[in-house]
A protein has these predicted regions:
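Hydrophobic, well-ordered secondary-structure segments
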Residues: 120, 124, 144-150, 217, ...
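Glycine-rich, flexible loop motifs
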Residues: 1-19, 23-50, 70, 77-135
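Short, flexible coil/turn micro-motifs enriched in small/turn-prone residues
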Residues: 50-56, 134-140, 163, 176, ...
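FAD-binding core of FAD-dependent oxidoreductases
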Residues: 54-68, 72-76, 83-108, 134-158, ...
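Hydrophobic alpha-helical context, especially transmembrane and signal-peptide helices
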Residues: 48-52, 130-136, 150, 172, ...
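C-terminal auxiliary extensions adjacent to catalytic cores
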Residues: 1-35, 39-47, 69, 73, ...
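Well-ordered mid-protein domain cores that form the structural environment of catalytic cofactors
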Residues: 110-128, 132, 143-147, 167-188
Length: 512
């Protein structure tokens, strides 16, 4: 099994994916253990002094003015975890919780939180045992970190609350720890607070969304190319010299991908209908510009994610010179903004794909294809309602594109009077990515059927590879009306599992 070693300098997106989705083991480096011990020494020294230190000898949030005596400090740390584990709603996905826990461990190991080495080791042990705390959908405002979600994780460290075992059964966390031979943690000064105060949930979901969107944007280039073929469009608009004079990197990559898929096609380069078009419709001609803008948005989001992965997000933080200082680094605005940017890009990519699908189904705009790609139009409805489903998905995506980060609701008696709503932005982006997959699947279904109805014209070799693979996957070709939902589900799985991309790349080589 793959092992990820956590040091003091952060982790990579690949590390997060390996742990969250691949179940990789986690180990602490010697450097991290030393940094943990050094920072803990600073916290212990400050805890022994009479001066108030936030999170060590004071209350939290609006209660920070309350001095906490020595004998109550362990209870203070337990209490913050218990009281902040106030999430509601359905459980979030296992991969999200594993990313959340791993990224909190990453920050703990930075040496800036004051958490003891044994607490960090217990976090790693829980991940390695396949124990997943029950975390709920609602409870984070994306400022002071993802407080409620991280509190549910910290509760498991204490042997309290509920968690899912490696067999998928939800049980008391204490029982699962005992079976795994893991001792619950007895929290000390600052540790409860340090386990809760980070942007780890929204960051983990951003990293996973970027991984999914990398595949989906390439898949969307493929389906756009297939639609262009089915509509007898021209590939001249994809010429590299046209995109070089507007040098947005994503646009050039998207155009290159489409051109690679279309190489060798007999359906492109000229118009086959009786009334030749001077230009194709925007949804066909401008596909690289729209997809490319989304790719460039992803590039910015990756940069934000990389910076956040290299960050130590906590409040207060332990500095090498011995100070423990309050700060505002827990504010999720940088992550929240790019999550919202991506939701807008996803909605627009889906919108242009739906417009191409609708064009394929309209006999007045499809340049010779039958109405709704039906076998016997009138008796058969063809893909009419598949486009309705696609339109419903796009409408939902437009609602999901409304920024969460533009909103803020004050909390904690107005002490925390501006928040990022980054967790909400991340949750809606996950739904958006899921729906984009379905939208691309419907375009794939329509475009492949349209190409097969162009008898006597040979599609591109890459298109042929996709056609062969999608038919083997159980997506039926042209013919009389039938129960469509199974075909659409098969197309969805074909896109979601990366088989569309893999089929095209058997001919094109790796797409950009």
């Amino acid at each position: 099994m793959h092992t990820v070693v956590v040091g003091t300098s952060g982790v990579t997106a690949s590390d997060v994916l390996a742990v969250a989705r691949g179940g990789a083991r986690v180990e602490l480096s010697g450097e991290a253990v030393a940094a943990l011990a050094a920072a803990r020494g600073i916290v212990d020294a400050l805890a022994a002094k009479p001066d108030p230190v936030y999170g060590v000898s004071t209350g939290f949030g609006a209660l920070a003015t309350r001095h906490i005596s020595q004998e109550l400090r362990a209870q203070l740390q337990r209490n913050i975890v218990r009281s902040h584990a106030a999430g509601m709603g359905p459980r979030v996905e296992r991969e999200v919780v594993r990313a959340l826990m791993f990224l909190r461990l990453k920050t703990v190991c930075s040496g800036h939180t004051g958490v003891r080495p044994e607490v960090a080791q217990t976090m790693a042990d829980i991940l390695n045992a396949g124990i997943t705390p029950v975390v709920h959908e609602y409870g984070s405002l994306g400022c002071s970190g993802d407080l409620a979600p991280l509190s549910h994780c910290a509760l498991t460290l204490m042997g309290e609350g509920e968690a899912e075992g490696p067999d998928g059964t939800v049980r008391p966390a204490g029982d699962l720890l005992a079976e795994a031979g893991i001792d619950p943690v007895e929290l000390r000064e600052k540790e409860g607070l340090a386990l809760l105060n980070g942007t780890d949930g929204m960051l983990g979901m951003l990293i996973m969304a970027l991984a999914d969107l990398d595949r989906l944007y390439k898949s969307a280039d493929i389906t756009a190319a297939l639609s262009l073929e089915a509509l007898l469009g021209t590939d001249k608009v994809l010429a590299p010299e046209l995109h070089a004079i507007r040098p947005h990197p994503g646009q050039g990559d998207s155009a290159a991908n489409m051109l690679a898929v279309l190489t060798g096609s007999e359906l492109t380069g000229h118009h086959q209908d009786d009334a030749p078009r001077v230009q194709d419709a925007y949804s066909v001609r401008c596909a690289p510009q729209v997809a490319g803008a989304g790719r460039d948005t992803m590039a910015h989001a990756r940069l934000v994610a990389e910076r956040e992965l290299a960050s130590a997000v906590d409040n207060p933080v332990v500095l090498p010179d011995g100070r423990v200082e309050s700060n505002g680094n827990f504010h999720g605005a940088p992550v929240a903004y790019v999550l919202d940017f991506l939701a807008i890009a996803v909605a627009d990519l889906a919108s242009i794909a739906e417009r191409r699908t609708d064009r394929l189904l309209d006999k007045n705009r499809s340049h010779g294809l039958p109405p709704f790609l039906a076998d016997d139009a009138g008796v058969d409805s063809g893909l009419m309602i598949a486009q309705y489903t696609q339109a419903a998905l796009v409408a939902e995506l437009k609602r999901l594109a409304v920024p969460a980060s533009a909103d803020s609701i004050p909390s904690s008696a107005m002490q925390e009077d501006h928040v990022s709503m980054g967790w909400s932005a991340a949750r809606k982006l996950r739904t958006a990515v899921d729906n984009l997959t379905r939208v691309i699947a419907v375009e794939l279904y329509a475009a492949t059927r349209g190409i097969e109805l162009r008898e006597g014209l040979t599609p591109a070799p890459a298109t042929r590879a996709v056609l062969d693979a999608v038919r083997k996957a159980g997506v039926e070709g042209p013919g009389p009306d039938r129960f469509l939902a199974p075909d659409l589900a098969a197309a969805d799985a074909f896109v979601r599992e990366g088989r569309l991309l893999a089929a095209a790349e058997t001919v094109t080589g790796p797409l950009r």
